[in-house]
Structure formats: structure tokens, C-alpha cells
Design a protein with these regions (language model features):
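Helix-to-loop junction immediately C-terminal to a conserved catalytic motif
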Residues: 63
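Catalytic Walker B motif of ABC-type/P-loop ATPase nucleotide-binding domains
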Residues: 170-174
Length: 252
């Protein structure tokens, strides 16, 4: 799936999301060193790096599972570094876990239950639920228990639930992992749909091609720090990124 001739002018907009000099150590061992990055409104940014490079730690810091030793996390000009995890969604942060994170109930009730927690009025709750069922192609699954959904169907349900809170910044953790190529293309389509709502998306994936099909830019983590950043073409010209992470994927 290619974006075609989309013209990107994100730099003229003020960043909606920023990391400023994020550092983290565990038991005296540095995991992240002065990580800085930014996303602009409507931008899709990839986060790449080999296993153990600190991607999961960085995500956990952003969502509030871990606390950075130093640095700031800024969303919509607000420093959320000290804000509890359960409050961050209210400030415009959405997160899709790599794990199968759905309730043991129907697809419809998975969505309606979240709507009832965050939206006032039963009529509006049902309206939003129906809208999301339509937009994420879930209407035919509305009465099906989420535990029997396929991997791609679960990803669509999880993405639909994220949109209930109308986030400005969304973290997607391996949303295309362990999916067939045809299903990957389908998930890419829905990621671009989320972007069309004006959301900024930070996304990880072990398959570089999957990311480069949809991202505007990417950051590469290595040696506890950012070793490369830029458009996919710029990343592929980085000798450090090629040596550390890409191997033979793009040598031809």
C-alpha cells in the first residue's frame, strides 16, 4: 500500500507530541539516553530498532507504565511526564497494545462499554458505537464474542475502541505482527483511516517494509539513543541504520 503523491508539510505545524531528552536506567544499566523526537498533526512516524533497543521501555514511559529518570513528554503543549497513567487518555493519548486486549463479551458491548464510561447520554453512546462498527467494518461481527475473533478482526476492534476518546496522539505497538500479508494491507488501510481523522501516530513493527509503506518519517533506536531519523528514503541512506538493523532487507 503506497501513499502515492501525498505532499507532506508537517514542519510548518507546531508539534502535537514531543519527547525531550528522555533517559532511563534499570539497576544502573542505561536503557535510553536523551531520546528526543516529535510528531506533527496528522503525521505517521515509525519507531524502529532491534530487540533490546529500548522501544518497549520508551512506549511504557509514554503511556505511564514507567517513569523516565530525566526528560519530558509533551502532548498539546502540556507536560504529561508526572500525570498518572489513567489520566493520560483524557489528555489526548491513545494506545494499542501488542497483546489481545479486549473484553470477554460481544464486539458491540466492547465498544458500548467504553462509550458508557466516557460519553454522556445513552443515545449518544449508541450512536458512537454504531458509527465505529461501520467505520471499522465490524457490523457483521457485532454479536460475536471478541474471544473468537481473528487477529485482524481484533486489531480493528481495538483501533475502534481507541477512537472513542478522540485521541490526538496514538501509539500502535506491533499492530501488524503475526498477520497474513492480505490482512496486513487491511490493517494499514485502517491506520490511514485513523490518520485521516487528524491523529498523529507513532508505530512500531519488526517488518520494516510494513512500516515504510505507511509512515511519513521514522526514528531508529540503537545503542540506547536515536541513531537515525528521517523519511524512509533518508533512513535507507543511513549507514548506521543499515548496519545496526536492516541487514539484507534493502541491499538489492
Amino acid at each position: 500500500m503506497k501513499k502515492g503523491f501525498r505532499i507532506i508539510k508537517f514542519k510548518k505545524n507546531k508539534p502535537v507530541f514531543e519527547l525531550k531528552d528522555i533517559s532511563k536506567s534499570f539497576d544502573g544499566r542505561p536503557i535510553l539516553k536523551k531520546i528526543s523526537m516529535e510528531m506533527h498533526p496528522g503525521e505517521i512516524v515509525g519507531l524502529l530498532g532491534p530487540n533490546g533497543s529500548g522501544k518497549s521501555t520508551l512506549y511504557n514511559i509514554i503511556i505511564g507504565q514507567h517513569t523516565a529518570d530525566k526528560g519530558k513528554i509533551i502532548i498539546n503543549n502540556k507536560d504529561i511526564s508526572e500525570i498518572p497513567i489513567h489520566e493520560r487518555a483524557k489528555l489526548g493519548l491513545g494506545y494499542l497494545s501488542q497483546q489481545r486486549s479486549v473484553f470477554n463479551m460481544s464486539v458491540y458491548n466492547n465498544l458500548l462499554g467504553i462509550c458508557q464510561l466516557t460519553i454522556k447520554g445513552a443515545d449518544e453512546q449508541r450512536r458512537v458505537t454504531e458509527k465505529l462498527l461501520d467505520e471499522f467494518n465490524l457490523q457483521h461481527l457485532r454479536t460475536i464474542n471478541s474471544n473468537v475473533l481473528s487477529g485482524g478482526e481484533v486489531r480493528r476492534l481495538m483501533m475502534a475502541r481507541i477512537m472513542i476518546n478522540k485521541p490526538k496522539v496514538i501509539l500502535l505497538d506491533e499492530p501488524m505482527a503475526a498477520l497474513d500479508p492480505i490482512v496486513v494491507q487491511d490493517i494499514q488501510k485502517y491506520i490511514l483511516k485513523i490518520q485521516s481523522y487528524g491523529c498523529s501516530i507513532l508505530i512500531t513493527d519488526h517488518q520494516v517494509r510494513n512500516l515504510f509503506d505507511i509512515v511519513d518519517r521514522a526514528y531508529v533506536l540503537g545503542e540506547q539513543s536515536i541513531i537515525a531519523d528521517g523519511t524512509p528514503n533518508e533512513i535507507l541512506k543511513s549507514s548506521k541504520a543499515i548496519q545496526l538493523y536492516f541487514g539484507n532487507q534493502y541491499t538489492n
